[in-house]
Amino acid sequence: QHDARKSEKDFERIQENMMDANNFLREIKFDDVIDEKLEQIHYDQWPLISTFYSRFFPAKVGVVTLAEMMRDKKSPIVDFEEFKIKAYDIAEEIARKMIPFEKEKERKRSQKKSTGLPKPYDLEEVTGLQSIKEQRYKDRYFGRVTKNKESNEINLDGLLSALGLVKVFSKNKDTTITLTKKGKDFCLYENPVFKGKVDESLSEDESDFIKNNCIPQRPVQYQIVKDVIRLVSETKHGKTPDMADDLDKVCRDSIQGMADSNKLGEYAEKIQRDVLDKSKEILKSNKVIDGKILDVKDDEKEVRNLKKLKKQTPVESIRIATMGRLAELGVVHWHINDSGRSEYTIPDKKLAESISK
């Protein structure tokens, strides 16, 4: 990654070659593309979009980078690790453009388009901690081949696979990657960032594509999205002192309803245990801490120490990630009020109704 960082203007080169890369993609039937030397590795079909994927824009960075590598190598299949290094480098270069702009414009957290991009690293020496951060980012957003300890099943993790945009082939230590038909279609949409804008991350067409073709693949996430939109649509803006509690309840009810149905198969038990039951345990523990805080409310230092002991529940993490991504897609408008609390409204009622049906 350090060597890739030394190479500057890679983002600009992708911009210059984008038309040729797209023309290369148009000639390929990705449904037919396979790496005959290796075995295809599939996404494990986890029915939620992981909270680790805070935004969707890095997926666009991934497919565009992949297209450029295909054009350069004149091959629809490229090395997986090489792709991850290149995609991270492009994401970091974009962050170097976005973050200074956002600081200059004093963008609030709710307005930042750089969320989900890696924090640029400027030191000459790469520390062990930085290497870990870089690898974690690449694994989460661009993909990682994993082996289930219980079943020994090999799967593909990461945002790109969760959205159904890529296919990966692996055997022993050799791993390659290509696009799916869906990944090709998503790549071919024009993107504001790759057109030179730094105050937008996804076009309306790209957002529509993700809403209509990607999110529905993850049934629990799709149900949460529909129920959350319904709640925000019915809430009078400014009338709710803190919408977070209401949104948490909607997320919890959506997940519980899906877990109780017969639609999740083997994942119902895991979602019940790791999301719902775990959230109940943490909430119970947090309430005990709240009681202790009341007992020492005049001791500011002790109050701060106790607050640090409180944990975020899995349901809260799902709510935060879901709302951030919906704001990115333009489905909800995210506003942070004077009290520092998040408020949400629906900018396009027809769009919201079409999703929440």
Task: Please provide the spans of the model-predicted regions.
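Donor-sugar nucleotide-binding helix/loop cap in glycosyltransferases
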Residues: 15-357
